[in-house]
Amino acid sequence: MIEALKRTFRSLCGAALAAALFGLAATVPAPAADKVSVVAAENIYGDIAAQIGGAHVAVTSLISNPSQDPHLFEASPSAVRAIADARIVVLNGADYDPWIEKLIKSAPNPQRAVVSAAAVMGRKPGDNPHLWYDPATLPRVAEAIASVLTAADSAHAADYAANLNALTGALKRIDVRVAELRARYKGVPVTASEPVFGLMAQAIGLAMRNERFQLAMMNDTEPTAHDLAEIERDLKEKRVKALIYNAQVSELM
């Protein structure tokens, strides 16, 4: 069962991220003058914008390396310029990428539209910020992106609508897979180093343990002695069937 869960985790990551996992660019190219310029904080949202916008958009994703810690990201001068000039900026929000919110505020642009996944999903700082693992997030963010693209470039509204329809149709395959996994794994006890996969685990119906420990790790605070002892006991006594580990963290304990 553990190996099956590991394979499931990898396949869901691949499905959700689609074609978005590429190297981190050192500089940001200038968009073509006849295209709608879109800047995404993370490439998963940049990929959504590119699929909806097609040939009519120039998309720049500032974080494209899955091992990059968004909390430690420092924007290059070209990235700062790209944000200042962008017609559309897409971000995660919920304190996952606060650096881009600061850059947006420092460069006011009345023609710029901002799409925040957290705002779309009604999430706030303190909530689990890994919103793309919620199967409901990407379709709703896609709708929001299509809406602002249509407002910025109404001449290609039909193309944006068609691309949105195709994308949301493709994303329904994830819903089907999640339903299959829920039927098989609902109630299976698991734990994690951080709540990165928490929203997907919730959708699948996994019984997530040690959530206070995970929050402490995510917030870079010391877990309590009780919470530390509890996760150690769960692992040593094999009370959980899988450990979901955040590769961005060098140590679990």
Regions found by a protein language model. Name each.
Residues M1-F9:
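N-terminal secretory signal peptides that target proteins for export/translocation
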Residues I2, P31-M253:
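Extracytoplasmic metal-acquisition and chelation regions
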